[in-house]
UniProtKB/Swiss-Prot annotation:
The gene is GGDPS. GO terms for biological process: isoprenoid biosynthetic process. This is Geranylgeranyl pyrophosphate synthase. InterPro entries: Isoprenoid_synthase_dom_sf (IPR008949), Polyprenyl_synt (IPR000092), Polyprenyl_synt_CS (IPR033749). Binds 2 Mg(2+) ions per subunit. A motif (DDXXD 2) lies at residues 116-120. Dimethylallyl diphosphate binds at R125, K210, T211, Q246, N253, K262, K272. Isopentenyl diphosphate binds at K77, R80, H109, R126. Residues 21-33 have a biased composition (Low complexity). Its cofactor is Mg(2+).
Length: 364
């Protein structure tokens, strides 16, 4: 049917509109049918497809763990693994179970490092850029949390290794120590962010919670899996080792030894109250220079070198820290002797006894 011309020679608007509407309606109806067919075809049997969606591809696992493997591929101190082997001189845990414990502690340790670096806004870890500078903060945090749960999965592999008379709840054991670890980390962050200098006693409690936690997880798991029915109380020694390790780490951070791996005096840049810094501030409460330097979180070498010189020469805090380390090391060696001796553990103490080089004051 041809459009009817109007009296002015144009096509009647109503007729044209009717034709367009008919065409549009037909097209819309066809499109709607296609859409319904596609939805029905794709989702009509969705319940049967749900099971396949539960399958987690290995390629996805690799993507999720990439921030974690980035850090694990960079060699660390391995002090915790060495400690586990040393304590096994006494506890005699079968090798397969011991390797699982090492894996669990390694996972928890690396996950905590990922989180620490984010919370401290660090730049370097083991001499390379920290993970979140490569993968971003959201992905790094998610991976760290994921690895915590992977460690709990590994715990289930230890249950068959428990002695028949053992009543230890492995999950509660690990959970209690992770609570302690986060309590310690929480106080460390609070002091830093509120610029509150703790007492030495408060600092030591924080370290015992934070650094000692992973050491205790390892030894408590080993005690639970040891074939020896009655063992001495090794935990005081474990706690002492954790404190020695952290104080030594604090001292090293103010020396040239750490410059390559962590950056020169990184604790000052992060505004942290480490053991030498706590002693220095508490030794001379009338001088606010060091506290003000921490407030600024300096990145320049000159300011940090000045702070180190102040702690070294004015308050003698570096000498004091070395003295505390020597005193604690002697007590640890005495405790090892009391427990029957342990050549592997004594070797670790000798390694840790090597005091850092004199503090670096010129990095030019």
């Amino acid at each position: 049917m041809k459009p009817v011309p109007s009296t002015n020679g144009k096509v009647d608007d109503k007729v044209e509109h009717h034709n367009l509407s008919s065409s549009s309606s037909s097209s819309s109806s066809s499109s709607s049918s296609d859409t319904k067919f596609n939805i029905s075809n794709r989702y009509g049997n969705f319940l049967q497809r749900l099971e396949a969606l539960d399958i987690w591809p290995e390629s996805n696992e690799q993507i999720l763990l990439e921030p974690y493997t980035y850090l694990t591929n960079i060699p660390g101190k391995e002090i915790r693994s060495m400690m586990i082997d040393a304590f096994n001189h006494w506890l005699q845990v079968p090798r397969p179970a011991l390797e699982i414990i090492k894996k669990i502690v390694g996972q928890l340790h690396t996950a905590s490092l990922l989180m620490d670096d984010v919370e401290d806004d660090s730049d370097l870890r083991r001499g390379v850029p920290v993970t979140h500078k490569i993968y971003g903060i959201p992905q790094t945090i998610n991976t760290a949390n994921y690895v915590y749960f992977l460690a709990y999965q590994e715990l289930t592999k230890l249950k068959p290794c428990l002695r028949s008379d053992a009543t230890t709840d492995l999950w509660s054991l690990v959970n209690d120590e992770l609570l302690q670890l986060h309590r310690g980390q929480g106080m460390d962050l609070y002091w830093r962010d509120s610029l509150t200098c703790p007492t030495e006693e408060e600092y030591l409690q924080m370290v015992n919670n934070k650094t000692g936690g992973l050491f205790r997880i390892a030894i408590k798991l080993m005690i639970a899996l040891s074939p020896i029915p009655e063992t001495p109380d090794y935990l005081p020694l474990v706690n002492l080792v954790g404190i020695i390790f952290q104080i030594r780490d604090d001292l090293l951070n103010l020396s040239s030894v750490y410059t390559k791996n962590k950056g020169f005096c990184e604790d000052l840049t992060e505004g942290k109250f480490s053991f030498p810094i706590v002693h220095s501030i508490r030794s001379d409460s009338t001088n606010h220079q060091l506290m003000n330097i921490l407030r600024q979180k300096p990145t320049d070498i000159g300011t940090k070198a000045f702070a180190v010189s102040y702690m070294k020469d004015r308050t003698k805090s570096l000498e004091y820290t070395r003295g505390v380390l020597i005193c604690l090391e002697e007590q640890a060696i005495e405790e090892v002797t009391r427990l029957g001796g342990n050549p592997a553990l004594e070797s670790i103490f000798e390694l840790m006894h090597v005091l850092p080089s004199p503090p670096a004051t010129d990095q030019n």
